[in-house]
Amino acid sequence: MWIFGPPLAFTVVYYLVSLKVNGFTRDFDFAYHQELVRGWRPAVYPTVDVFLPVCGEPIEVLHNTWTHVRQLADRYPGRCVPFVLDDGASPELAAMARDFGFRYGTRENRGWFKKAGNLHYGFGQSDGKYILILDADFTPRSDLLEELLPYMEADERIGIVQSPQYFRVLDSQNWIERGAGAVQELFYRSVQVSRQGSDGAICVGSCAIYRRAALDTNGGTTLIEHSEDVHTGFDLRGLGWDLKYVPVALSTGVCPDTAGAFFNQQYRWCSGSMSLLGSKKFWEAPIRFSSRLCYMSGFFYYIHTALFTFVAPLVPIVLLLTSPEMLQVKHLVWVLPSIVYTAMIFPMWHKAPYRLEAWSARMMYGWAHVFAIWDILRKQRMGWQPTGSKGAKKNKTRRFWLGMWIWSGGTAVIWVGAAVYRLFTGYPPDFALVLSSGLFYALVVARALIQPKEHHAEVRPQELQTVGDTA
C-alpha cells in the first residue's frame, strides 16, 4: 500500500491549501450590492463597448446572443456600442451585425494570437471607458451594466469586474449539457467568492467588464494563444489593479453538448491555468502571498483530478486483491463521513440537479486534465478551438476514448468483479460497501461511454434569473 503514499500526501497538501483559501471566508454581501446598485445614478453615464468575439460558432447561437445584447444596449442610459469581432470574416455575420445595428470588424492578421489577438484588434478600434466581453454563447441580462459598473465607478483601482458564467440545467438538454452545467456551480458559487476575500478571484474572460485605462497599462489583453482571460487578469493584478468578483447571475451560457466539445473546453481551461504555473511571471509578480496561494490552489486542483483519474479506482482494487481484511465493517467508521458528504451533502448543496451525469462529467474532465498536463510536460499542446465551433465538435478525442474504455472501463470491471468474489468467499457485510461503490463507479463509466445522439435543436432564448438571485 506504500505506493499510494505520494498521491495521498499530495492530497493532504492540496486540501490544506484549499482549506486556507476557501475555509471560513465571508459570504457575498448582497444587501450592500443592492444598495450600491440602487444608489448609482451618475449625471453622465460612462461609455461602454461590448466586444463580441466570434470564430465559426453556429449563426443561430450568435443571433440569440445578439438579440439580448441589443436589449442591453437599448436599456443602458449611456453610449453602449456592441462590436462584433469576427475572426471568420463571414459576409453573413457582417450583414447580421448591420441588421442589429452593431459595429463589425475583421482583422487582416486573422489567427494571430487566436482570441487574444482578436480582442487586441477590438481594443485598438474602440474608445469606450469600459469594455464588456461576451463569448458567442453567453446571453446577458439587459441590466448587466447597471449591476456591475457601480463597482468600477466606486473604486478606480478596480481593473476588472467579473460576474459568473452561469449555466441552466434543464431536462430538455442532453446529459452532457446537464452534467457540464452542474459541475460549474461549485466554482462560481463558492470557490470564486472565497478567493475574493484573499484577493485571488480569477478572471474568466466572458461576462466581465474591463477598465480601458487598466488594459492600457498592459498594452491591451495579454497576447497569448490560450486562456488570455486568466493571464490578463493575473497581469493586471501584478500591475497593481484589483479584480472584483460579483456572484450575481447576469448572463447565461450554453454548455458543450458533445464529448469532443466538452473535452476541448476542459482541456483548454486546464492547459491555460497550468501554463501560468510554469511561467516566470507567476513567481516574480508583485502580488500578495494569499493571492498567489489562490492560484496555487487552482493548479493543485487540476493536478489532483488528473492524478486521481488513475488512483481513485486503484485503491479499492488493491485492497480487494491484497488486503481484504482492511475492508472489514469495523473500519467503516473512518470512511463513513466521506461517503455521507460525497453521496448526500455535496449533491444536496447544489441548486442545479446534481445527478449521475454530473459524476460522469467529472470523470470526463479528469481525462481532459490528464492529457492537458501531459501535453504541457512534453510541450505539444493542442491548438486552440472555440468551444462552440464546428472544429471543437470534431476535436480528436481518440486518446480520451482509449482512456475511458481501457482504464476507466477496465478498472470498473475489475473492481466489481473482485468485490463480488470477496462477497461470496468472505463475510458479505465486509464487502457490501465496496461493492456498492464499485457499482456506482461502473454506472458513472457506463454513462460516459453511452454518448447522446447528435441533434440540432432550435436555440431558444435563455431564461435568466431575476436581479435578486446570486450564482
Where do the language-model regions lie?
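Cell-envelope/extracellular polymer assembly enzymes that use nucleotide-activated donors
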Residues: 46-51, 81, 231
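Short, acidic, metal-binding catalytic loop of nucleotide-sugar glycosyltransferases
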Residues: 65-79
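Long helical/loop segments within the catalytic core of UDP-sugar-dependent glycosyltransferases
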Residues: 21, 25, 106-130, 142-226, ...
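Catalytic donor-sugar/metal-binding loop of nucleotide-sugar-dependent glycosyltransferases
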Residues: 224, 233-251
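A conserved acidic beta->alpha catalytic loop
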Residues: 85-93, 109
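N-terminal membrane-anchoring/stem segments of glycan-assembly enzymes
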Residues: 1-42, 97-99, 304-305, 424-466, ...
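The conserved acidic donor/metal-binding loop of glycosyltransferases
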Residues: 135-139, 236
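Basic/Trp-rich segment in TM-proximal cytosolic loops or flexible interdomain/linker regions
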Residues: 20-39, 198, 259, 269-431
